[in-house]
Amino acid sequence: MADHYEVLGVERNATPDEIKKAYRRLARELHPDVNPSTEAQERFKLVTHAYDVLSDPQQRQQYDRGGASGFGGGGGADFSGFGDIFETFFGGGGASRGPRSRRERGQDALLRVEVDLDEVVFGAHRDLEVDTAIVCETCDGSCCQPGTAPVPCDICHGTGSIQRSVRSLLGNVMTSSPCGSCRGYGTVIATPCVTCQGQGRVRARRTVPVDIPAGVDTGLRLQMPGSGEAGPAGGPNGDLYLEIKVKHHDVFSRDGDDLLCTLEVSMADAILGAAATIKALDGDIRLELKPGTQSADIVSVKDRGITHLRCSGRGDLRVGIQVVTPTKLDHREKELIKKFAESHKASEPSLARFQQGLFAKLRDRFLNV
C-alpha cells in the first residue's frame, strides 16, 4: 500500500492545514468531473483514502504507529476492509464506489420529416432547424463560472458518500450512502455559471444537416448518432432519430419500390396503336402502345421506379392504361361507328367476376404483373 503522506505529497510532520490544502489541490486535478480517465479515478481513490486517514487525528496517530499498512498496535480496528468483504458477499453496504460524475449522456431526440415522392427516388439533403440542448459556450460544459472550478465537498471530503459503522448479526460493518450535501458528486459548484445556471448546457435552436437516403418510406426511422441533445456537464450527445413521412402525390403512387400511374388514351389510339410521352419523376419517358391495347393493360418500364434503400438498382415504373370512350358524338361520327360495328361482329356480352371499376382491374393487374 502506498504511503499516505507520499500520496498527498506532504511531509510526515505536515500540519492539518497543509494536508487539507494538498488534498484540495489533488482533488481538483483528479476528480471525475475534471479528469474522467481510469488512472485519474484510481489516484483519486488513493488521495481520498489518504486524506480520510490523515485528516482524522486518531486515525493519523494510529497510522503513524503502524506504518504504511494503516494498522497500529492498539485502539479500534479499521472496518473498511471488512466492509469490502461484506459487499463482496452480500452486494451492498460496503466501501464507497467513488463519487459519481456530473457528466451524463444527453437525451435522444425525435424529429418528423416530410419528403416528396421525387425526393424518395434519388434521396435528398435537408438543413433542419431543431430546438435542442447544446453545450454552454460560457463555461464549455464545466458548469462553473470561468476561472473557477468545483471544490471538494466538506461533508464527504470528495468521496461522494458517507460511511457509517452499524451493528449487525455479523458484527460491526461499514455502510455507505450518497452524501446529501453534494448529492454524491463529491464536489460542489461554488460559483455556478450564470449563463447555464450550473447545468453545463443551454436550450437553443441549431441547424442539423441531414442526408435522406433514396428509398425511404413512411414510418422509417433514421438514426443520427451524436446529433441529439448535449448531456449535462459536458456529457456526450444523445442520438437524433428522423421519422419519415412521404407526401401524397397527385399522379404517382408506390408499391414497394415500383411506381404506379394511369395513362388515359383515346379509343382510336388504343385500337390503332400510338406513341405517348409521359412526364415521370425523373424526366420524360416515351411509351409505345400496341394496336388493340385494352383498359387495365400494364406497360412496365424497367429501372424507372424508386431506388432501393439497402442495395443498388431501382424498381420499375408500371403504367396502367385507361381507354377513354367518347360520350358525345355528332351524327357523322355515330354513322362511322355503326359501320365499324357492322363490319366487326362482336361477341355477345358475357359475365365475369365483379370488379369495382377500372381501379380494381388495375389493382389486380398490378398485383399479378
UniProtKB/Swiss-Prot annotation:
Main location (coarse class): cytoplasm
Pfam families noted in UniProt: DnaJ, DnaJ_C, DnaJ_CXXCXGXG
Binding site for Zn(2+) 1: C136, C139, C193, C196
Signal peptide positions on this chain: none
Residue span(s) of domain J: 3-67
Alphabetical list of InterPro entries matching this protein: DnaJ, DnaJ_C, DnaJ_domain, DnaJ_domain_CS, HSP40/DnaJ_pept-bd, HSP_DnaJ_Cys-rich_dom, HSP_DnaJ_Cys-rich_dom_sf, J_dom_sf
Subcellular location: Cytoplasm
The keyword Transmembrane helix belongs to this UniProt entry's keyword annotation: no
GO MF assignments: ATP binding; heat shock protein binding; unfolded protein binding; zinc ion binding
Record: residues binding Zn(2+) 2: C153, C156, C179, C182
Chain intervals annotated as zinc finger (CR-type): 123-205
Entries under SUPFAM superfamilies matching the protein: Chaperone J-domain, DnaJ/Hsp40 cysteine-rich domain, HSP40/DnaJ peptide-binding domain
Cofactor: Zn(2+)
UniProt domain comment: The J domain is necessary and sufficient to stimulate DnaK ATPase activity. Zinc center 1 plays an important role in the autonomous, DnaK-independent chaperone activity of DnaJ. Zinc center 2 is essential for interaction with DnaK and for DnaJ activity.
Function: Participates actively in the response to hyperosmotic and heat shock by preventing the aggregation of stress-denatured proteins and by disaggregating proteins, also in an autonomous, DnaK-independent fashion. Unfolded proteins bind initially to DnaJ; upon interaction with the DnaJ-bound protein, DnaK hydrolyzes its bound ATP, resulting in the formation of a stable complex. GrpE releases ADP from DnaK; ATP binding to DnaK triggers the release of the substrate protein, thus completing the reaction cycle.
Protein name as annotated: Chaperone protein DnaJ
Organism whose genome encodes this protein: Leifsonia xyli subsp. xyli (strain CTCB07)
